[in-house]
Regions:
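Non-catalytic interface/targeting segments
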Residues: 1-52, 110-119
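Short active-site-adjacent helix-start/loop capping segments
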Residues: 42, 75-78, 103-104
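A short, acidic, amphipathic alpha-helical segment used as a generic capping/interface helix at domain edges
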Residues: 50-60
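Mid-chain, well-packed structural core segment of small domains
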Residues: 58-94
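Beta-hairpin (beta-strand-turn-beta-strand) motif
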Residues: 71-74, 98-99, 120
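A short glycine-rich beta-strand->turn/loop micro-motif centered on a GG-aromatic cluster
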Residues: 92-102
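Conserved phosphate-binding catalytic cores of ATP/NTP-utilizing and phosphoryl-transfer enzymes
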Residues: 102-111
Length: 120
C-alpha cells in the first residue's frame, strides 16, 4: 500500500507491506513503533505482550496523546486488563488493521496531533 502525504519534519508513512514500513526515507522491519520524531523496531510480537512497561519505554522518547496499534490484516483488540493498564498513562489507544492504522496515523500527524503507531 502506498501513501503520498509527506512532511519533511515528521515520520510520515510512505508505504507498508507484510514485513516492513517505509517512513520519510527510512525502512523499518515490523514490528515497529513510529511517532512524530522517533521510529524504532521493537521486540514485541503480538498484542498480548503489550503492557505498562512496554508502553513506558515507547512514550518516554516522544510523548503522545494517542497510540494506534496496527494488528495485521484484521483488527484484534486489547484485553480489558490491558485497556485498564494503558489507560493509567492518560493515552488513548485504538486497535485496527494495518492499512487503517497507517492511514489514521498520517491523517492525525497532518493535523499536528501527538500520535504514535505500533505496527505488529
Amino acid at each position: 500500500m502506498e501513501f503520498t502525504q509527506q512532511n519533511a519534519n515528521t515520520n510520515t508513512i510512505i508505504s507498508v507491506d507484510e514485513s516492513s514500513i517505509t517512513i520519510s526515507n527510512s525502512i523499518l522491519s515490523r514490528p515497529c513503533f513510529v511517532s512524530t520524531n522517533n521510529a524504532s523496531e521493537v521486540s514485541i510480537k503480538n498484542l498480548g505482550e503489550i503492557g505498562k512497561e512496554f508502553l513506558f519505554t515507547l512514550v518516554g522518547k516522544d510523548p503522545i496523546d494517542l497510540l494506534i496499534i496496527g494488528t495485521g490484516n484484521s483488527p484484534k483488540f486489547l484485553s480489558p486488563k490491558q485497556q485498564i493498564e494503558l489507560s493509567e498513562f492518560g493515552i488513548g489507544v485504538e486497535c485496527m488493521n494495518n492499512s487503517s492504522a497507517c492511514s489514521s496515523f498520517n491523517l492525525l500527524l497532518g493535523d499536528l496531533r501527538k500520535v504514535g503507531l505500533l505496527l505488529l
